Amino acid sequence: MSDIHIRQDGRAGRITLSRPKALNALTYDMVLKIEAALDQWRADPTIDLLVIDAEGDKAFCAGGDIQEMYETGTAGNYDYGRKFWRDEYRMNAKMAEFPKPVVTFLQGFTMGGGVGVGCHGAHRIVCADSRIAMPEVGIGLIPDVGGSLLLARAPGRLGEYLGLTADRMDAGDAIHAGFADHFVPRETWPALIAALCDTGDPGAVGRAAHPAPRSRLADWQPQIDACFGGDTLADIHHAMPDPGPEPIAHAQKLMARNSPLAMACALRIIRTVRGADDIRTALEHEYRYTARSMERGDFLEGIRAAIIDKDRSPKWRHASWRAVPEADIVAMEGPVTDAPLQF
C-alpha cells in the first residue's frame, strides 16, 4: 500500500497521508509526491481547493522519517539530510503560497514536518484530540518547515515560549497561537470533506465550526510575555522567578531537557524571521541551521537519545544555557554556499 494517496475528488485535489502505523511520518518520497501534486493542481481549472487529511486516529503527521538521516549522518555523510531538507522546504513554500484554498484536518499529533504540510493553509481544522507542537529543540534541531514564521507571528512572546520549550498545544491553544483556525468535532469531518469535494466551497468550513475551546496558553500569556522577551537565553532565564508560577515552572522543566545550542539558535531565528514575515525568508534562515545541525549541532545526538537508543539522556554539546557562547550561534547562521536552498 502506498504511503500517500493523491487524487481528484469532485472539485477538490485530495492528499491523504497513509502511514498510520508510523504516525504518518513524512518520507522523502512523500515530500516529492506532495510537491508534484501542488505543481499539477496550481493552475488546474477543475480544482477549486485542496483537502489534506491522514489515516488513523493517533496523528495527522508526527514529523519527518529521520531514520535515514541518522544512519547517513553518523557515517559522516550529510548530503542526504541536506537534500531532504532542501526539497521539503521547497514543498513547504509551495504549500504556503498555493493560490487556492487549502483545508487541512489535523487529528492527533501534528508535529515538526506535519506542521509544514498541515499548518500553512488558510483553513486548518482541529478537534478535541489535536496536539500540535514544534518539538525540534528536544532533538537538537531548530523549528523548521516554516514553523519559525508561525512562531514569529504568534501573539506576544508565545512564539519564543513554544519554540524554546517544545510544549504541546491542544485545539484551543493552537487556534490562539495561530497554528489552527477552526474547531470542528471529529465525527463531522467525513460530511464536511464530502461537502468540500462536492461544492469546492471553503465556506463550508466556517459553517461547520464550533466555538474554540478555552486556551491554557491564553491564560498564561501575561507570565509568558514577562519572561520570554529577553534577547538571549540568559536574559530569559534571569527573568524567570524561582520559584515561579505554574507557567514559568512548567517552562523551566521543559527547557531543562532541550539542547542549549538549539534553543539559542531557535531564539535567534524567531527574532530574525519576525522582522521579515515571509515564508521563503523563514525557510532560507532555517536551512542555514539545519544544514549544519549534524556536523556542528546536536541533531544526531538528539535522535540517538530520543529514537535510536531511547535512553532519553542526550549528551548535548553545551552543558547548560549558560555555556552557549555567541560564536557557536554565529557559526550556525551564515548562508550555505555549497548546497544552497533554491525555490
Task: Report the location of each language-model feature.
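Hydrophobic/aromatic residues within transmembrane alpha-helices
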Residues: 15, 52, 65, 117-118, ...
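Amphipathic alpha-helical blocks and their helix-capping loop/short-beta junctions
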Residues: 182-258
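Conserved CoA-thioester-binding segment of acyl-CoA-metabolizing enzymes
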Residues: 1-53, 93, 331, 343
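C-terminal amphipathic alpha-helical interaction region
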Residues: 289, 297, 301-343
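Gly/Pro- and small hydrophobic-enriched strand-loop and loop-to-helix capping segments
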Residues: 121-144, 176-192
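Loop-centered beta-sheet repeat module
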Residues: 154-199
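Glycine- (often His-adjacent) and acidic-residue-rich active-site loop
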Residues: 54-87, 140, 332
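Glycine-rich beta-to-alpha active-site loop
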Residues: 95-139, 161-167, 171
